[in-house]
From Swiss-Prot:
This is Holo-[acyl-carrier-protein] synthase. PANTHER family: L-AMINOADIPATE-SEMIALDEHYDE DEHYDROGENASE-PHOSPHOPANTETHEINYL TRANSFERASE, PHOSPHOPANTETHEINE TRANSFERASE. Keywords: Cytoplasm, Fatty acid biosynthesis, Fatty acid metabolism, Lipid biosynthesis, Lipid metabolism, Magnesium, Metal-binding, Transferase. Its cofactor is Mg(2+).
Length: 119
């Protein structure tokens, strides 16, 4: 059973501006594992990567109904890719998490669907 849905869209140029102070912003948004991946990227690919993770984490927080804040922080959520490149959201929830991330020339968008783990 679906118990939550969240979606977030972010302008890539907004993230690009925040990446000027690259390390501080990335430390606030990305886990250590995500930062390690990000450090290997440059230019528009770095912007897309960070924007996609930002949108995914915001979408997850909306799906659980709290938003980013006291109960859920950016660092409580990690996005990895499986062996085929599919984004996987890692968090402490018991629920099944479905994540989709997409980019265009100007935007990154992510959608999260939370499903009850009991059938």
């Amino acid at each position: 059973m679906i118990i939550g849905i969240g979606i977030d869209i972010i302008e890539l140029n907004r993230i690009e501006k925040m990446l000027d102070g690259k390390l501080k912003f990335m430390e606030r948004i990305l886990t250590e594992n995500e930062r390690n991946v990000a450090m290997e990227l440059k230019g528009s690919r770095l912007t897309e990567f960070v924007a996609g993770r930002f949108a995914a984490k915001e979408a997850y927080s909306k799906a659980v109904g709290t938003g980013i804040g006291k109960e859920v922080s950016f660092l409580d959520i990690e996005v990895k890719n499986d062996e085929r490149g599919k984004p996987i959201l890692i968090t402490s929830t018991e629920h099944i998490v479905h994540l989709s991330i997409s980019h265009s020339k100007e935007f990154a968008v992510a959608q999260v669907v939370l499903e009850s783990s009991s059938r």
